[in-house]
């Protein structure tokens, strides 16, 4: 839809991802307070969320690089590699489990981290889809993933490529991100 940079090199994709992550962090903070988590466990939840973002993004790019082997014929991680949701979910989830139980064992009293783990899963079940929804809207604005070309009423114009004459070529496609 609009894959161009707006300001400071940021695109709408970057802005939507940032809004999604901030919204998920704020929701996690609100839910930990409402559920009565101790201050030390709240800090651990924030560290878990940060580790999920960092490790999740790294694994999302890594998983996409494996998918790209079929297209490029070699394993390459560069600016065009992209990211996959499932790679981020697996890596981010693994990072959260490790940090939550390791830090919980060392910094929480009375085994609170283990007792509150079901609550932590509930919080994650709310925050992950929230961040993902904003991310999918960002993906829609980037025009990186879409369905087939269509003439249906629900099709939207998306940037496809720039031809040899330097003109942008747009196609009406199925907006898969809006259906997820």
Feature annotation, model-predicted:
Residues 1-179:
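Hydrophobic, membrane-interfacing alpha helices
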């Amino acid at each position: 839809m609009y894959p161009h940079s707006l300001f400071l090199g940021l695109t709408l994709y970057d802005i939507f991802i940032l809004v999604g992550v901030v919204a998920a962090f704020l929701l996690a903070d609100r839910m930990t307070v409402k559920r009565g988590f101790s201050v030390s466990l709240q800090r651990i939840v924030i560290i878990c969320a940060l580790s999920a973002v960092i490790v999740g993004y790294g694994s999302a790019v890594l998983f996409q690089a494996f998918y790209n082997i079929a297209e490029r014929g070699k394993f390459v991680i560069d600016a065009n590699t992209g990211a996959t949701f499932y790679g981020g979910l697996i890596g981010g989830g693994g990072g959260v489990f490790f940090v939550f139980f390791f830090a919980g064992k060392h910094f929480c009293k009375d085994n609170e981290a283990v007792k509150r783990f079901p609550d932590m899963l509930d919080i994650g079940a709310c925050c992950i889809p929230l961040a993902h929804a904003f991310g999918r809207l960002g993906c829609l604005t980037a025009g990186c993933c879409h369905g087939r070309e269509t003439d249906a009423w629900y099709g939207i114009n998306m940037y496809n490529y720039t031809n040899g004459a330097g003109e942008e070529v747009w196609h009406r496609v199925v907006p898969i991100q809006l259906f997820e």
